[in-house]
């Protein structure tokens, strides 16, 4: 029986230059109604875990959560999946540094109605400004389908959980000694504990993916970072 994983694999093969017939067939058969464009597999792991914490199964809802292998690929995937391709509703999550790739890629794919949402800090400031101006025009929700992490997804999760809780999770996962060794490196001097933890998560192959899921599962749904909350609410 065809599933969302098969559709995801078909889309990735199509984006790599293969035929698109299989993706088109599965999009209709499943059916698929929306695609979430993410930079990498750690983002997919976190989004899946956070959705599950809210009792949601995105695949069963017809939502394909897709790792593109980097933000520079967003234009290619948007062309295949968006208005000029399969006609799916597009949304996504990106790092602040990659905002431009998303904006340009979506515009070139004739999906200009999708614009980058503000990162957490900017959203907070905007909310305060709007509260002071009750008659100010509010952004159209349809214009806020790309959600931007202030630094990256790991940074959002670490800030939401707090350094102490993340260190407890690292200990529980059996990586405390590796973390202590990492923290003794001269390059880590002068960095905040939050910055050190974020860098630690990317020091070993597979660690970022693993901890994206661990941190997301440990997060209280009520404390979900704004970009992630916005993404899930939009789906």
State where each predicted segment sits.
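RecA-like P-loop NTPase motor core
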Residues: 1-91
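Short phosphate-engaging motifs
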Residues: 43, 73, 98-100, 153, ...
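Long, intrinsically disordered low-complexity tandem-repeat segments
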Residues: 112-139
């Amino acid at each position: 029986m065809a599933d969302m994983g098969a559709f995801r694999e078909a889309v990735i093969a199509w984006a790599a230059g293969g035929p698109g017939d299989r993706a088109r067939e599965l999009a209709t058969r499943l059916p698929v109604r929306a695609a979430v464009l993410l930079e990498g597999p750690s983002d997919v792991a976190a989004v899946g875990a956070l959705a599950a914490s809210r009792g949601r199964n995105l695949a069963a809802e017809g939502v394909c959560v897709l790792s593109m292998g980097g933000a520079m690929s967003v234009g290619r995937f948007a062309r295949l999946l968006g208005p000029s391709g399969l006609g799916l509703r597009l949304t996504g999550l990106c790092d602040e540094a990659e905002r431009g790739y998303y904006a340009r890629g979506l515009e070139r794919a004739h999906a200009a109605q999708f614009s980058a949402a503000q990162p957490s800090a900017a959203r907070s400031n905007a909310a305060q400004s709007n509260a002071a101006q009750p008659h100010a025009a509010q952004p159209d929700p349809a214009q806020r389908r790309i959600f931007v992490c202030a630094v990256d997804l790991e940074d959002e999760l670490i800030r939401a959980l707090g350094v102490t809780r993340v260190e407890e999770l690292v200990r529980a996962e059996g990586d405390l000694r590796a973390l202590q060794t990492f923290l003794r490196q001269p390059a880590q001097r002068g960095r905040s504990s939050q910055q050190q933890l974020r860098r630690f998560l990317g020091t070993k192959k597979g660690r970022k993916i693993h901890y994206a899921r661990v941190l997301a599962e440990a997060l209280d749904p009520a404390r979900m970072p704004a970009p992630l909350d916005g993404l899930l609410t939009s789906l």
